[in-house]
Amino acid sequence: EEIIATKTGNDFVTFEIKNVAPIAVAKKYAGIGASLVARIRNTKTPFGIDFGVGDVIVPKQEKRKIPTQLDDFEAPTVNTYSLETTVAEKLDAILSLMEFSSRMKDYYDLYYLANKFDFNGATLTEALKKTFENRGHKFTVEQFEQVMAFGSDDAMQKKWKAFCRKIDTKTDDYGTVLKT
């Protein structure tokens, strides 16, 4: 509440906290998830923010400007995970859940990041190693191969197509996304 009450000089947008709850309760890592609604006059935009607790960040946290959709507003700067740690955490989630994952967003985010940013291989490898260790996971080559095989899995293809319709994107087919 203190954060969203901070004076910014922006009187047009208001925020309401809908829910705050622990995330990843059953896992060996934790955090807090907040569901909010932003309002500009009669327009409501729901969104969520996850606050990680106890995560390993490689090489270090980053300050990142979040672009706004309205030209007259200053882009806020927030502390974020490094992109390498973001990739590692998403890959960890995919490998942990395998075909039970309904989070096509993780696949999309990895695809987007791989196409938008250049990564240092050594730094990314270190982020993967430390994230997997921190979460108590050891993955095999066979698990990676199984994820790649999802490209020809009808159920996963169906989930991917539904996700793409939901976010209104013309992103490549699921098999291409997996190869990226």
Per-region residue spans from a language model:
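Structured mid-to-C-terminal alpha-helical surface segments
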Residues: 1-180
